[in-house]
Amino acid sequence: MYLQGFGNYHHSEAVKGALPPNQNSPQHCSLGLYAEQLSGTSFTRPRHNNLRSWLYRILPTVTQGTYYPYEFNIMQPLVDELSPNAMRWSPLYNSSQIKCDFVEGLFHIAGSPLVNAYTYYCNHSMSDKYFANNDGELLFVPYTGEIHLHTEFGKLMLSSGSIAVIPRGVKFKVEVISKEAKGYLCENSGNPLTLPQLGPIGANGLANPRHFQYPVAAFENSVGEHTIICKNQKKLWFTVCNHSPLNVVAWHGNYAPYCYDLSLFNTINTVSFDHPDPSIFTVLTSESEIPGVSNLDFVIFPPRWMVAEHTFRPPYFHRNYMNELMGLVYGEYDAKKEGFIPGGISIHNCMTPHGPDYESYEIAASQDLKPNYINSLAFMFETKDYWQVTEQAYRHPSRQIDYLNCWQGFKIEFSQ
């Protein structure tokens, strides 16, 4: 069961009477609870941008204890001098016999001033271990397996073909439902993700607000040792407290985790000719101070009909002002016949040329242009700043050092 509607002002209580009926912070909360506000923006942001929630919890967060440096860090050094070459990786993870939870299985791929990209692998649930990111919100894009995200606000269920966003500062733990789970993760330290403007598309289309789902209140009333790991100022810290931090019995507000089924995306595409720009596939965006230039765009290339006439239908050859990190959830990407499979990654930074490989080009340039259904799901994390690759990703054996060879079959066919 979920609450529906992107950015709505929701309210939920796991125990009847836990929510104050007429105010935020009564002198004495019912059921012996404590009132606590969680702010996602400054107090004086305009009303339509203002994010906050009131939580009614068994113990306030100030009782969590002292944080100390954690034994390892997920943030990794970035390559100092990065070439303008296109880069691609095969999937980083194989199945592991070693127990690995979500935090232990994070792999830092690349970063920019406001955004970081990771992959995750986990085959072991976080039972009495919790995570919070004070540096930004987290966007989950799974490509195999099923996980449940137990948060301060309630539970989200997540599997391939869906996404979830955990806001900055919200504590959660990952329960692995399948044998193992793998996915992509994007950390956004800019403005919170929101729905893109639709412009001439009109009032409807792309990701519809009604399809975003928020959790109903659920809580853990457990005592004993509970470890909280917190990412703060690019470092990991930990504390051990004597109770679960997921002790919120009721909440109301518009700052909360949410999930979304990507199959509900209302795809807009051409019904005449030419390949539209990929911005029409934007699901969520983090706006910058420059209109139309985003800190982060989350873009998908979902299952869709291709019907353009007298047109080269795959994505065109391109040199972009923006910086692209792509992944594949399932299927075969229509611009890459080989080498780009689910779990793979490609990075094409500003002005780095990219486009269909030779084999894909040859097929698309000569095929009979009947209506064709593409049954795949690729995505892109697009940023205004360069993706700086981490040293560990650059040296990883899954990096395809021969990636550029996929374009070497093209020949000069010009004739006068």
Curated annotation (Swiss-Prot):
GO cellular component: cytoplasm
Entry EC number(s): 1.13.11.5
Keyword Iron appears in the UniProt entry: yes
Keywords: Dioxygenase, Iron, Metal-binding, Oxidoreductase, Phenylalanine catabolism, Tyrosine catabolism
GO molecular function: homogentisate 1,2-dioxygenase activity; iron ion binding
Residues that bind Fe cation: 318, 324, 354
Pathway(s): Amino-acid degradation; L-phenylalanine degradation; acetoacetate and fumarate from L-phenylalanine: step 4/6
Keyword Oxidoreductase: yes
Gene3D superfamilies: Jelly Rolls (2.60.120.10)
SUPFAM superfamilies linked to this entry: RmlC-like cupins
GO biological process: L-phenylalanine catabolic process; tyrosine catabolic process
Catalytic-site annotation from UniProt: 275
EC class: oxidoreductase
Cofactor(s) the protein needs: Fe cation
Reactions this protein catalyses: homogentisate + O2 = 4-maleylacetoacetate + H(+)
Lineage top rank: taxon: Bacteria
Residues engaged in binding homogentisate: 333, 354
Protein family: Belongs to the homogentisate dioxygenase family.
Function text: Involved in the catabolism of homogentisate (2,5-dihydroxyphenylacetate or 2,5-OH-PhAc), a central intermediate in the degradation of phenylalanine and tyrosine. Catalyzes the oxidative ring cleavage of the aromatic ring of homogentisate to yield maleylacetoacetate.
Subunit: Hexamer; dimer of trimers.
Name of the protein this chain belongs to: Homogentisate 1,2-dioxygenase
Gene: hmgA
